[in-house]
Each structure stands twice: as C-alpha cells, then as structure tokens.
From Swiss-Prot:
Signal peptide: none annotated. Pathway: Protein modification; protein ubiquitination. WD repeats lie at residues 1090-1129, 1132-1173, 1175-1212, 1214-1246, 1247-1289. Residues 1417-1506 are annotated as: Interaction with NF2. One of its GO terms (molecular function) is nuclear estrogen receptor binding. This is DDB1- and CUL4-associated factor 1. The lineage of its organism: Eukaryota, Metazoa, Chordata, Craniata, Vertebrata. Disruption phenotype: Early embryonic lethality. Conditional knockout in mouse embryonic fibroblasts results in severely defective progression through S phase and subsequent apoptosis. Conditional knockout in B lineage-specific cells arrests B-cell development at the pro-B-to-pre-B cell transition: mice display modest reduction of D-J(H) rearrangement, while V(H)-DJ(H) and V(kappa)-J(kappa) rearrangements are severely impaired. D-J(H) coding joints show longer junctional nucleotide insertions and a higher mutation frequency in D and J segments than normal. Keywords: Acetylation, ATP-binding, Chromatin regulator, Cytoplasm, Cytoskeleton, Host-virus interaction, Kinase, Nucleotide-binding, Nucleus, Phosphoprotein, Repeat, Serine/threonine-protein kinase, Transcription, Transcription regulation, Transferase, Ubl conjugation pathway, WD repeat. The protein kinase-like region mediates the threonine-protein kinase activity. The DWD boxes are required for interaction with DDB1. It comes from Mus musculus (Mouse). Its EC number is 2.7.11.1.
C-alpha cells in the first residue's frame, strides 16, 4: 500500500512541477530546481522499474513494456506537454548559455531517453549535436559526461554517425584516455582501501565468482535431474514459456527489435521485496523439492543483498561518480565500436585490456558498468582482429566468470552471439581445453532457458551458427540440448490450440513468433550438421564392406558448412543406400518428444501470420527440418498420422500431416514463394521416392545400431513406401503435383519447381493405382507433358529444364511401360499403336522389287543389264500395278520391345511432298563381300514419294551416304591429317572402334523398314496384314462393322426397315449428333412489370406445361410454356433461389436459397402450395433418384438424408479425414439410391460407411453419377464405379455443371455463374465457355456441338421428351456485374433461321444504343432534335442490309462436325415436312401421360384462378 501511495505522489508531484513551470518559465525565474526535481523523480521511478528485472536490451517505451509501471506514466505526462519538451531541447540545451541550466536539461534529457525517439530529436534539431560534441570535449563535470551519454543515443542512428566521422574520431580517443584514467584511479583507490562488496557476509563475500552457486556444473546437474523434476513439479520445468506460471525464469518481458524479442513483465507492487526475492530464486533454479542444487547462503539471502547483481544499483545521475562517468562513456562508445575506421583507435588505445577489466565483476563490483562494457565489447567482437586477440588472451574464460543470473549475464549472450559470427575466433574457442568449451555450451544453454527474452534469442542464434562445429554439437547433445531447444516452441502460448495466446499483447505475440522462427532456424542447422555426420558413417560402412580408402572426417574444431544442393545430395544418398529401418539418434529423440506434430502445427498456424514479416522464413525453416528428418522411415510414417490444427474459423480440427505439406507446396498460403514450395516438395520426394528394395548389406552397418534380419528389410521399406504413396494420393497429391508441372511463376524458379514436382510424380507413379490414373489424364492422353518438355520457362534455367526433361522421360516410361525416345511427341495411344506395328509381319511381292530394280537400271542407262534381269526373272515388260500375282517375300516381325517406328529429321512429312522418279537414289557401289544381315529396326527409314506419271510408288533410298571409289576424279595418294573429326586417345581404342562399325544395310531390311513406316502411319494399324505392295501406298482398313449406319440421315432413315431401330450400328449416335447440334430460340420469359428481370434458376413442371423460374428475390413463378404468360407466383425465400426440383409426380417441389433461413425447403403442390418441411442448414437439396422417398441435403462438406414423409434426418454422411473440401459440393444419390456421392467420396447408404475417395483434380465441382449407374463424373474426370479406375478425361467439361437428358444419352455442360464477384470476374476471363453450353454424347463423351448464347449462363434444364431446353441468361453487360436475367426457351433439333439471327442482331444493336444513351446524357438532347422520318428510313435501310448479310452469314449454332453440317444443308428441302411430323409426334407424346396425378397442374391453375 505504501508503494502505491509513493507512485501516486510521484505522478502528482510531476504534474505540480509542470504547472509551476508553466507559471514561471516566461517570467525569468530559475528553472534549474524544477528540472533537477523532475530528474530525481524520473531516476527514482527508473530504479523502481528496474527492480522488476525487465529485459536490459528492451528499448521500447517503458509504458509499452510494462503498462503498469509508474515510469511509463511519468514519461507520457512529460511528452504530452509539447511546450515543455520544446523548451527543454530548444531553449535549455540549444540556445541557453548558462552551464547550470544546460547541465540540468541534459540530465533530464538523459533520464527520459528510454521513452524518446532519438532520431527525431537529433536529426531534426540542427545544432544540438554540435553543442553536445563541444560540451563533451570542453565542458566541466557533470555536463561533460551527460553530453557524452547523450551523444551515445545520437550515434545509434547511422546517418548521424556518418555525418560526424571526424568529430567521433577525435572524441573516441579523448574518452578512451578518460576511461584509462578512471580505471587507474579505481585501482589506486582499491589498493588504498578495499571497496566493500554490495553483498557483505560475516566472513567473505558471497560472490567469489568461481564459487558462485550457479556454477559451470549447473548444466550437468540439470541433465541429471530434469526428468525427475518434470514428474514431481512442472513448476520448475527447464523451459522457456511465455508468461507461464511454471517458467524457470520469471523474466516476462515483451518483444523489442526483430532480432531481440522480449516479453512482458507483470509487476505487482503489493508484494515488494518478498516477491522480488521469490522471482530471483526462480531464476537461479531454486526449488523446495531440490535443496541440494543451491548453497544455503544464497538461498537464505534477502533480495536486497542479491539485487545489486541481478538488476544493479545507483540509477541516479547526480552526484557524478567515477562509475556513472565510465558507464556513460561506454554508452557513447558502444554504437561506434562496429565501425571499421575507428578500429585502429580502439586497438591502439588498449580497448581490449579495458574491456577485460570492466567485464570482471570482482574488479568493478557494479553490474550496470559491466553490462555497458559487455555491450561495447560485443560491438568490437564484430572485427576479426579484435575477436582473435580477445579469445587468445582468455576473454572467453572471463565471460564465463560472470555470474548467473544477472543483468551482465544477458550481456554475455550478445557477446557470444557476435563471437560466433567470426569463424576464425570460434575455431580458436573450440580448440580451448574441453572444460572451457563445455562451460561455454553449458552457459549458453542456461541463457537459452533462463535468461531474458533477448538472452534466449542470442543464445539460440549462437547455436544456429555454432552447430557447424562438431565439438559444440557433441557437447550440445551431451547436455540434452535438443530437448531444451525444442522446449522453446513447445511452450509457446501461440501454439496452444485452445486460446492461441488470446490474452497476449501484440508485443508478446511478436516475441513468441520470433522465438518460433529462431528455434526453427537452429533446428535446421542442428539436423544439417547431424545429417553430414550420419552420411560419413554410412559411407565409411560402405567402404569397409566394399573396400576402398576410408575418408577421415574433418577435425571437430573446424566448421563444416553445406549448400542447399549438398544437403539434398546427402538426403538422397541416405534414402538410397541407408537401411530400411535407419537408426538415427537425433531423429529418435525428436520423435520421442513428439516434435514432428509440433512442427506441423507450427507450419499450419504460421501460414496465418499475415502481418509477421518473417512468416515465410519460419515456415521454410520448419519444412527444411522435416525434409531432413524424412530420410528416416519412422518420421515419414508420422506425416501419415493425424495432427490437430486450426481451421479457417479458428476451431481445432484433425488433418493428416502430409496434407499440410501438400497445401504449402501448392502455393495455397504463400503465393509465388518458390523457396517454401521447393522445401515442401523435397519432403514429398523423400517420402515417395525411396528405393523399393535396399541393399541388404547396409542393414547392419553402424556401430550402436541393432542388427536386423535381412529378409525383413525390403518388406518393411515396401510397407512404408506403399503407405506414403497411398496417403499422398488420398490427400490429393496427384492434383497438387500436376498443377506444379505447368507452373510459370515465379519465373526464376518455375523450372526447378517443375523438375521437383515431376521427380515426386516419378516416385509416386510406382504405385499401380496412381499410374492408372495418370495414364488417363491430359498430361499423357493429350501429349501435354511433351509440350512442357520443349522449352524451359526461363532460358537461363536450362539446367533445371534438363532435369525436368529427364524426370518427365522417366515418368512417361513408367506410365507407358515403354522407353521414351527423345525428340518425339509420344502419347499412350501412339505407344500402343507403335506396339502393334512392331509386332506386324511385313511381307512384299519379290517381283515388285525386281521391277523397281529394272526400272532403276533403265533410268541409269544400263539397258542390257535390265534386259538380262527381265529375262532371268521372268518379269513383265510393263510395270505392274497389282501385286497379287507375285510371291511375297516375308520379313520376320520386329521384336516386341521396339518402342516406336523410327523417325528421322527429314522424315515422312518432308518426303511426302517431294516428286521424284522411281529409283532416284541407290547405293553408289555394292560392297565387296555380302555383309551379314543387320538386326531389325537398326536403320532410319525413308518415306514414300509420288512419281509424276506412274502409279503411286514409294521412293527407296539409303539414308547413310557412302563415298564412291569411282567418282570420276583422280584419287589422291597423299593427304594431310584432318584437323577435325573424332579423336582417339590410343591405337587400341581406334581398333576397338573399328571392330564395332555397323554393317552396311541390306536391300531387304531397307524395304521392310520402309513398309513398316507406312504401316505406322495407319490410323488403326493391325498386327496381321496382307502382303504390302511397293507400287501402291499401304493403308489398313478402318474398323467398321458390317451393319454400320450411314452418316447421311436420309440413307439412315431408309435403312430402318432393314436395320431397326436406328438404321444400323451407331445410328443412334449419329441421330444424337444431328439433333443435339441444333437449337432454335423460340421465346423469352421476363418478369412482368419489372425494369430488370432477375431469374436465377429454372425447371420444367412434371407435365411440362409450365416453366418454373426462381427469382433473385426468393419468388417462384410459373409460366405457361406455350403462351408465355405468368400463371402463378409464390414467395418461398427471402433471398435468391438457387435450385428447383419438382418430383416426378408433380406433388412436391424442392427449393434452395442463397442465405435466408431456411436455406432449403420442401413444398407441397397439390390443391394448396405450402411448405412441408424445412432444411435450415442445407444449401442444396435434391430427391433420391429411384423412389423419391428421401431428400439428400448438403451443408458444406456434410450430407444429410431426410425422410420425405416425416422430415426426420435419417443419416449424416461425413468423414473429416476423407474430406475433399470442394467449394460447390452437392451430394447426390446414384440411380438406384444405394450409393451417395458427397464431396468426392462414395458412401454406402445402408451401412453409412465411406467406400472410396476419388482423387481430387479441381477445387469446385464435387461430381454426379451417370444415369447408367456405372460411372461417376467429377469435373473433367470419368471414373469407373466397378474398379474405381479413371476411364477418361473430358477437358471441355472443366468447371461445367452437367445436366443429362431424360434418357441419359446426352449431357449438357455449361459454365455457370460464380457465387461471388471475384470468382465471377475470374471465370469470365478464364473460361472460353462462359457464355456457351456444350452437348456431349453421354455414351462415349465425345463433344457434339458448342452453342454460343453470347450471354453468361445461370442455369439450364431440359424436358423429358428432349423437345425444349430452358436457359437462364444474363442480359446485362459482359463487363459489368449488373443482373438482368431472362429465361430463353430453345427448341431442340431445329435449325436456326436466318431471320432469327437478323432479329437478334437488331436487338443487340438496340441494346447497345440504349447503353450508349444511358452513358452520355448529352446524346439524348441531340436525338430529340433529329427528324423521325430520317430515323425510320435509316432503320429500314439497315434492316435490308442485315437481311442480305444474314443470308450469307455464319450460323452461330453450327455443329462441331463440318461434314455433318454440309450433309444437313443438302436435306433442307424436306424440313417443312419433318417439322409437321414433329408436331404430330409432340401431340401424341403429350396425350400419352397416364399418371394418376395428371391433373395436378390443372388443379393448381384452377385454385389460382379461384
């Protein structure tokens, strides 16, 4: 209570002093007493603030670091008084010439520096720095020292320091000499009379520092007792936890700089010295359960005796003492110590000896002075020369003598951190005696756990750098360093899924994130160092097993640093050659501490740190740690386990670990951050690219590794691999990796990301299930991967592109089973065709070959030889065009393994166009001896050419040209050696090459391969062929059934009498192509009495007399299909209706809305239109398909099944582990109501169990069943329900809603409007079908036609008789988001007339004119002045022009097949008769409805009329 009163008095007194200043400052009164009293108040509260033991490196405003502290309140009161602050700087410091006033002002300014923005004061106020330099050189005490201290604050700004280089050079030398003088005075005074220690005991000081209670043995003791402590008392756990009740160090100070995070200290003034004593005991690690760890003297000491070592004393600046003067001089020197140009001055004037004196608390007995000296020492340690000398002269040992806990110990952390940056100095440290280095590691571990937040930060970064020294690494492991390091993040409140640090301030959250970042960075360095050690062990074991020279490791005092590429190579080597159950001690410890899940949680949570500057670095460090650890199969299996993370709403959910990695790899959270994507991909590669079976001899190679049975090794590895393949596939890994294959941004890393993704796919493709799916995707079926292989994204990254091509070729080989020949575009269909060609038996008539030879001889003027050949071979005198009379020569089929038909640069395409005579090319000279027959397929092939007057004859030529010995020129006997060509290192190699020269080809092999090339060009090659003719080009017959229906509709109609029911095989398909490629608009439905129509969805009524339309206001409107009149209107929802589905009997109707409650409802449509049941949370509902006795509703990823009669919920189908999270999930029944497809997962309705999860390849469409019940269509993928194999991919269905006709033979695909504006604009830019719908043959998924309606489509529906199609079209501008949606009714199978096109063009022009009129108000005035007669004449002329143009214009609704269109145009004469017949058919169909509910729609109309 007394403390509170004192605080209130301080605040009131400062307010009174300011009021007194307001009265007196203009009257010439002496302001020195007021300023002096203010300084005393500030200094008193500074000492109170320091008693709370805040982080000494925390440079925030005290009121921000501790909102309850009085010092912060006093500083805010001062800074709010602008007049006083301006007078303090301008009048009392800059312009006043009165030394007492200057002194008082400088003292106050120095006191308020913790809350002052120094850059503003010293940069904006011209002349103040010059005054301070002048006083620091010439003024009397204490102004001289105050000025020096203020200059220290000014020089922290680098711009100011750079502007005053000369002044600083002079002043540094002056103050260093002053320090030397003051030091000598201290030594002299000590010799005269020993200064008593701040802590006096009856005998000797408690702190002879080598006997400090917390000595170098603390680390060993911590290792021994830590497990027992965790069991007995969590309050004393050796950990660093933010603001936690069981924190060993109670320093809870907030974050400061990005590299020096701090934590908040909640100070309670009520407890006074007793509370401070308790906190100090906590810092020392005291525990009532462990009294042996401390000395009795220290535990019995009061806080007043301990405080001088922990927080220091003498915060007052007056009277000036040598200790205060030295402290302020060191504050000035600290920011200047890092400048290279001042280093000679520091070295010359003995800064090292001075610092060695000041960091010795036995010499100074002033912890504040020692702390300032340590800060200055840290800045000097940045220089290599100084650091080397400091280490050589025992400086490290001096640092280790500083007691813990104390403010000076926190200063040691910065010195160690800066020392670690100097590799030469650290090597010298590592060469110290073992006990010294052990003390360094132990001291730093204590700092990491029990120091202030800045000390923890410095210690963590020290280890990050020093893990490259094996000596430090070994000691770190000996003292259980990994557990103590992991504790830093395991105890962070921001990783607590329950509250996520909700009670923390922004500064505390920032500090926690900094801790996570630094810890992950240290963990990455730790495991990289251990990875190199493990690699050495494996290599040495291999060398012992297989022989060879042992590689000696680098000395432990030498730093080992590795590039990212080297780390990747190490991981690949261990995965490839390590044992199946690799035992790795650090990984085992990490696994035991459950740190894999911890890192996954950190990655997941850090992805949402949008405002944290180092978010990307934190995630990348954590990913790199996991990448290294996944060389161990145990860790890989951890990624297949569930992890608790937060969803978008902040709720805890369970997800598979690998899905987090895949999400990061996809770029879901970090757009265009290539480093993060590469790190995530490396994890996936390590998990899926391990060897199928490992070298068995490695299973027992490491000392300390248990021996394993060799037979179990491949089995275990295969089990792990298979599980990882499965978990990556089930978490949509195929989709992620495929999307990364076509990545183009960031352009500098796209090629490398492609290569890594392709490498992961190669490993994943060893799974037969994955291989089957990939083989059906456009990547292979449409040769997309070959297109990607042609050019790199960035030409400068060709080396990465070469790797991508290598992996892509391997992927093709795995999926197709055939090796890829580089330079060819190979799809699976081509490879299968090449396989058939390779197995074909090639034969040709022998006499045709002899005829070709004879013709060639005649063309060369060798008539007699040709005559002899004709006579001996009994050849006809004229060239035969038919080969049936000749005996064929048979060539054996090529081996089955022939991958493809050979292609050469000037191949088929170039030779098809050439016209040459028969036999234009032949061997120049026959070989001296008949060569042996070469193997089949060893030569490239020529292609055919066409002779001018003869029948089509292939040109046969040798590709390999040979020099002729008789070329008509004199042969040169002597010739100098060529200076180019191949080079042989020795004659032996040359002889070896000569022995391997290929034999010259035979004529038979040339012709055989030439014919095989012809055969390969067939569209559908067959394995068994008749003899090939050399005179006519070969062509395999097209596969065609005997009863194939003709393409011409008239012929097909005539053949129905012979081949019912479609005129032959495929007649129905041809009919569908004819009918569903023609759509004629017949009417438009608009909302009556509305400026803009707002229809959102449509459906035909049960008897199809009415068109049911939902509006954006939630109304349901019924329009007569034939008259176009609105017959009824109902209010169903308060928001836009998105879905309508009437039951087949017409008695019920389902509706869904966007946001109003209920979201969906079931309505009765008998005599009264009323709501039967509501489905409050389901955004989409539909009837069961077969019996329509149930309703299935969709709420996000969850499917609900309801009973229609009672409205009760029967089933809920959802499994969070299987969720695909499609954005537009719509659950649906299969045609027999036994199965449900929800969120891409197939469910059994009877058992309510998930059967299969289909792979995800898109973000939006969840899929529908095909009416045949055998297939599932999910966006572009067609899946077989019997085998779950991927059957086809239909790229044209991408992002389209699929609607089947009543018979299930035709499906419509339309790109629907997006739900929100951002997606809407994105889809308009992305989709070529945003304003069109397409029709497909539902039996083979071949496209029939694309119908461009020139408007964005909201919905479409078809009637049961395939007569009409209703489409909701947006009449608004394509570039705007305004809605004017109408329903346009199309007649199916009718061709659009030219006058319809003209009318539509006129309508478009009128709409465009109206838009122009609305945009320009001035135009309306001009239009009023125009003559109406002239306007009418202009319109008539325009109509005539449009009619003439329309006759020759293109048909907007043209079918996809041009040939079919031409055939249809020929049959236009009979269209009138056909239309009459169609009308009769419609009437007949309309009268055949014999349903019991056939009069329901009539009842509705009658009731409405009543």
């Amino acid at each position: 209570m007394t403390t509170v009163v004192v605080h209130v008095d301080s605040k009131a007194e400062l307010t009174t002093l300011l009021e007194q200043w307001e009265k007196d400052h203009g009257s010439g009164q002496d302001m020195v007493p007021i300023l002096t009293r203010m300084s005393e108040l500030i200094e008193k509260e500074t000492e109170e603030y320091r008693k709370g033991d805040p982080d000494p490196f925390d440079d925030r405003h005290p009121g921000r670091a501790d909102p309850e502290c009085m010092l912060g309140h006093l500083l805010r009161i001062l800074f709010k008084n602008d007049d006083f602050m301006n007078a303090l700087v301008n009048a009392y410091v800059m312009t006043s010439r009165e030394p007492p006033l200057n002194t008082a002002a400088c003292r106050l300014l120095l006191d308020i520096m913790p809350g002052l923005e120094t850059a503003v004061v010293f940069q904006e106020k011209e002349g103040i720095v010059e005054n301070l330099f002048k006083w620091a050189r010439e003024a009397d005490q204490p102004l001289r020292t105050y000025s020096t201290g203020l200059l220290g604050g000014a020089m922290e700004n680098q711009d100011i320091a750079a502007n005053y280089r000369d002044e600083n050079s002079q002043l540094v030398a002056i103050v260093l000499r002053r320090l030397r003088e003051l030091q000598l005075q201290e030594v002299a005074l000590r010799q005269d009379s020993k200064r008593p220690s701040p802590r006096k005991l009856s005998s000797e000081p408690l702190l002879p520092l080598d006997e400090e209670a917390v000595d170098m043995d603390y680390g060993d003791m911590a290792v021994d007792v830590v497990d027992g402590e965790q069991e007995s008392s969590r309050d004393m756990e050796i950990s660093f936890r933010l603001d936690s009740s069981h924190k060993t160090s109670s320093r809870v100070n907030s974050a400061t700089k990005p590299e020096e995070g701090g934590l908040k200290k909640n100070k309670s003034a009520k407890h006074g010295d007793r509370e401070n004593f308790r906190k100090a005991k906590q810092k020392l690690g005291f525990s009532s359960s462990d009294p042996d760890r401390v000395f009795v003297e220290l535990s019995n000491s009061s806080w007043s005796e301990m405080s001088p070592w922990v927080i220091g004393t003498n915060y007052t600046l007056y009277p000036m003492t040598p200790a205060i003067e030295q402290r302020l001089i060191l504050q000035y020197l600290t920011p200047l110590g890092e400048y290279q140009e001042l280093l000679p001055i520091f070295m010359q004037l003995g800064s090292r000896e001075l610092m060695m004196f000041y960091i010795d608390l036995k010499q100074t007995n002033d912890v504040l002075l020692t702390f300032e000296a340590l800060k200055h020492l840290a800045s000097l340690l940045l220089h290599n020369k100084f650091a080397t000398e400091f280490v050589a002269h025992g400086g490290v040992q001096k640092l280790l003598e500083i007691p813990r806990p104390s403010m000076a110990a926190t200063g040691v952390s910065m010195c160690l951190y800066y020392l670690s940056y100097n590799q030469d100095a650290m090597e010298r440290v590592c060469m110290h005696p073992h006990n010294v280095l052990s003390d360094v590691v132990n001291y730093t571990l204590w700092l990491m756990e029990c120091s202030h937040a800045s000390g923890c930060c410095h210690a963590t970064m020290f280890f990050s750098i020093c893990f490259s020294f094996r000596a430090v690494l070994e000691l770190f492991d000996r003292y259980d360093g990994l557990r103590r390091l992991v504790n830093l993040i395991s105890t962070l409140e921001i990783l607590n899924l329950e509250d996520q640090g909700a009670l923390l301030s922004d500064d505390e959250i920032f500090a926690s994130r900094q801790t996570g970042k630094h810890t992950c960075m240290a963990l990455r360095k730790y495991f990289e160092a251990h990875l190199a050690i493990k690699l050495e062990q494996v290599k040495q074991s291999l060398q012992r097993t297989e022989g060879g020279i042992l590689v000696h490791p680098q000395p432990p005092y030498k730093a080992c640093s590795y590039t990212h590429e080297q780390i990747v190579e190490m991981m690949e080597f261990l995965i490839e050659y390590g044992p199946a159950q690799l035992y790795w001690e650090p990984a085992e410890v990490f696994l035991k501490l459950s740190c894999v899940q911890l890192l996954l949680q950190l990655i997941s949570i850090a992805c949402n740190w949008k405002t944290y500057y180092a978010r990307n670095d934190t995630v990348r460090f954590a990913l790199d740690v996991l990448a290294i650890l996944t060389v161990v199969p145990k860790i890989q299996l951890q990624l297949a386990e569930s992890v608790d993370v937060l969803d978008e709403a902040g709720s805890a959910v369970s997800t598979v670990g690998i899905s987090i990695i895949l999400g990061v790899a996809e770029g879901e959270f970090f757009i265009h951050d290539a480093e993060i994507q590469k790190s995530a991909l490396q994890i996936i590669i390590n998990c899926v690219c391990g060897p199928d079976n490992r070298i068995s001899s490695i299973g027992k190679f490491i000392s300390g590794t248990p021996r394993r049975k060799l037979s179990q090794t491949p089995k275990s590895s295969e089990h792990t691999l298979a599980k990882m393949w499965n978990v990556v596939q089930s978490n949509n890994g195929i989709k992620v990796l495929l999307s990364l294959l076509s990545i183009k941004m960031p352009i500098t890393d796209a090629d490398q990301i492609r290569a890594l993704a392709c490498k992961a796919l190669v490993g994943l493709s060893r799974s037969s299930t994955v291989r089957q799916i990939i083989s059906k995707l456009p990547l292979f079926s449409s040769c997309q991967i070959q297109q990607l292989m042609k050019e790199p994204v960035l030409q400068d990254k060709r080396s990465d592109h070469v790797k991508f091509c290598k992996y892509a070729a391997e992927l093709i080989e795995r999926v197709s089973g055939k090796p890829l020949l580089i330079g060819t575009d190979v799809s699976l269909a081509r490879l299968q065709k090449a396989d058939v060609v390779a197995q074909s038996r090639i034969s040709f008539p022998e006499k045709e070959l002899l005829l070709l030879i004879r013709n060639h001889l005649i063309s060369k003027g060798l008539g007699e030889t040709a005559t002899v050949l004709t006579r001996e071979a009994d050849l006809p005198m004229t060239a035969a065009s038919h080969s049936s009379a000749f005996t064929p020569v048979t060539a054996a089929a090529s081996p089955v393994s022939l991958p493809r038909t050979p292609r050469i640069a000037n191949g088929i395409a170039s030779r098809l166009g050439s016209h040459a005579t028969v036999g234009a090319s032949a061997p120049s000279a026959p070989p001296a001896h008949p060569p042996p027959r070469p193997p089949q397929g060893s030569l490239p092939l020529p292609g055919p050419s066409y002779a001018g007057n003869s029948p089509l004859i292939g040109r046969i030529s040798f590709i390999r040209e040979r020099p002729s010995p008789c070329n008509g020129r004199k042969i040169r006997v002597l010739r100098q050696k060529s200076d180019h060509g191949a080079y042989s290192q020795s004659p032996a190699i040359k002889k070896q090459l000569d022995r391997h020269l290929p034999s010259p080809p035979t004529l038979d092999s040339i012709i055989t391969e030439y014919l095989r090339e012809q055969h390969a060009r067939c569209k559908n090659p067959v394995a068994t062929c008749p003899p090939f003719s050399l005179f006519t080009p070969h062509q395999c017959p097209e596969p065609k059934q005997r009863r194939q229906a003709p393409i011409n509709f008239t012929s097909r109609l005539n053949r129905r009498a012979s081949f019912p029911k479609y005129g032959g095989v495929d007649g129905g398909c041809f009919d569908r192509h004819l009918i569903f490629s023609r759509f004629r608009p017949i009417s438009v439905f608009r909302e009556a009495n509305e400026d803009e129509s707002g229809f959102t969805c449509c459906a035909f009524s049960a008897r199809e007399r009415f068109l049911m339309l939902g509006t954006c206001t939630g109304q349901l409107k019924l329009y007569n299909v034939f008259s176009g009149q609105e017959e009824a209107s109902y209010n169903c929802h308060n928001s836009a209706i998105t879905h309508l589905e009437p039951s087949r009997d017409g008695s019920l109707l389902l509706t869904s809305a966007t946001w109003s409650q209920p979201l969906s409802a079931l309505w009765g449509m008998k005599s009264v239109f009323d709501m039967k049941h509501s489905f409050t949370e389901d955004h989409y509902v539909e009837f069961s398909k077969h019996s329509q006795d149930r309703v299935i509703g969709t709420k996000g990823d969850i499917a609900h099944i309801y009973d229609i009669q009672t409205g009760n919920k029967l089933l809920t189908l959802f499994n969070p582990d299987l969720a695909n999270n499609y954005k537009r999930n719509c659950a649906t029944f299969n045609p027999t109501d036994d199965l449900v497809l929800n969120d891409g997962v197939l469910w059994d309705v009877r058992s309510a169990q998930a059967i299969h999860k289909f792979d995800k390849f898109n973000m939006n469409i969840s899929g529908v069943f095909h009416p045949n019940g055998l297939e599932v269509i999910i966006n572009t993928e067609i899946w077989d329900l019997r085998t779950f194999h991927l059957l086809h991919t239909v790229p044209a269905l991408d992002q389209c809603r699929v609607v089947f006709n009543h018979t299930g033979t035709v499906m419509y695909g339309a790109m629907l409007q997006a739900d929100d504006e951002d997606d809407l604009l994105e889809e308009r830019m992305k989709s070529p079908f945003g304003s069109s719908f397409r029709t497909f043959n539902a039996t083979d998924y071949k496209p029939i036609a694309t119908i461009d309606v020139k408007r964005n489509i909201f919905d479409l529906c078809t009637d049961t008789k395939d007569c009409y199609l209703a489409v909701i079209e947006n009449q608004g501008s394509m570039d705007a988001l305004n809605m004017d949606t109408v329903c346009r009714l199309y007649e199916v199978g009718r061709q659009r007339l030219a006058e319809d096109e003209d009318e539509e063009e006129d309508q478009e022009e009128e709409e465009q004119e109206e838009e122009d009129d609305d945009e320009d108000d001035d135009d309306t005035d001009d239009l009023d002045e125009l003559d109406t007669d002239q306007l009418l004449e202009a319109e008539l002329e325009e109509d005539d022009n449009n009619e003439n143009a329309g006759e020759d214009g293109d048909n907007d609704f043209s079918p996809s097949d041009e040939e079919l269109a031409n055939l249809l145009e020929e049959g236009e004469e009979g269209e009138d008769e056909d239309s009459d017949a169609d009308e009769e058919v419609e009437l007949i169909l309309g009268d055949t409805d014999s349903s019991d509910n056939s009069d329901l729609e009539d009842d509705i109309i009658l009731s409405l009329n009543e």
